[in-house]
């Protein structure tokens, strides 16, 4: 009986240790700020069809690499030392709420110069899952 319980527990642990990453459609936008001046940048809300999501944590796989894509693009455009974040959601409605909240924070105060990074000049490329 002990062997049966032990082997069942071992199987359960091994199954939960490997969380599957599944491609999914997500909506995302990027935000960049510089600590050197008062300029902030927003990308458009973009739909990415094949972004990988960790099925266990529901978190975007390799999110930092999406932020690096934005950082590299802004540096090519002459933006000095941008600090970038990428925000995602599974529904258009949720991402629009997040976008509006963050944008309002920077436009209402009048302290920041808000710039747009439009879709034709910048689009997120899906990050491939690597095991």
Task: Give the label of every model feature segment.
Residues 4-15:
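Sec-dependent N-terminal signal peptides
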Residues 48-53, 75-86:
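Acidic/histidine-rich, surface-exposed loop or edge segments in extracytoplasmic proteins
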Residues 4, 34-36, 92:
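Generic structural motif
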Residues 79-131:
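Surface-exposed, polar helix/loop patches in the mature regions of secreted/periplasmic/lumenal proteins
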Residues 1-4, 19:
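Positively charged n-region of N-terminal signal peptides that target proteins for export
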Residues 60-75, 79-80:
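Tryptophan-paired
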């Amino acid at each position: 009986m002990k062997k049966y319980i032990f082997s069942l527990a071992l199987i359960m642990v091994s199954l939960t240790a490997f969380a599957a990453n599944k491609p999914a459609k997500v909506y995302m936008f990027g935000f960049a700020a510089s600590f050197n001046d008062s300029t902030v940048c927003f990308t458009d809300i973009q739909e990415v069809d094949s972004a990988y999501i960790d099925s266990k944590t529901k978190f975007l796989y390799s999110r930092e690499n999406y932020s690096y894509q934005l950082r590299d693009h802004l540096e090519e455009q002459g933006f000095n030392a941008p600090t970038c974040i990428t925000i995602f959601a599974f529904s258009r409605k949720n991402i629009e709420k997040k976008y509006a909240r963050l944008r309002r924070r920077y436009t209402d105060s009048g302290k920041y110069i808000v710039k747009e990074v439009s879709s034709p000049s910048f689009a997120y490329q899906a990050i491939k899952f690597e095991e």
